[in-house]
Amino acid sequence: PRRPVEAALAAGDSILLEIDAQGAAQVRDAMPEAVMIFVLPPSMSAIETRLRYRSTDSEEIIQRRVADARLQLEHCGAFDYLVVNDDLSSAHDQFQAVLVAELRKRARHDSLVSRFAGISAL
């Protein structure tokens, strides 16, 4: 839902949405300043292995999910960053690095520079 996201952003919070490429395109249309991170599997075989390890899906569902993952990969070029999900700790560190970099962008702090020095940061 859009309203809680907008409220959190207005409060200065960062928001993480787990959505597919189509959802990401809708967010980008509504909020061009949104930062998009595409989570890549270490390999296509890793996706299948992970799904089989869970032992919760039928063969048909596993094959459908693998095919969907391939389709999603076709859209990774529309994202700002790529994170490879081969290790949870490493993926977390990559997300953290993106967050820190984005929060420190000069463009996000123009008013601070102006207040500090009485000049434009541009």
Q: Model-predicted segments: where are they?
A:
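NTP-dependent small-molecule kinase module
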Residues: T56-D57, E74-L122
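An acidic, carboxylate-rich microenvironment
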Residues: A46, E60-I61, S90
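Alpha-helical elements of Rossmann-like donor-binding domains used by nucleotide-donor carbohydrate transfer enzymes
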Residues: P4, D68, Q94-V98
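Residue-level signature of catalytic and energy-coupling elements of molecular machines
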Residues: L16, A69, V83
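Glycine-rich S-adenosyl-L-methionine
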Residues: E59-D68
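ATP-dependent NMP and nucleoside kinases share a basic, alpha-helical "lid"
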Residues: P1-T56, L73
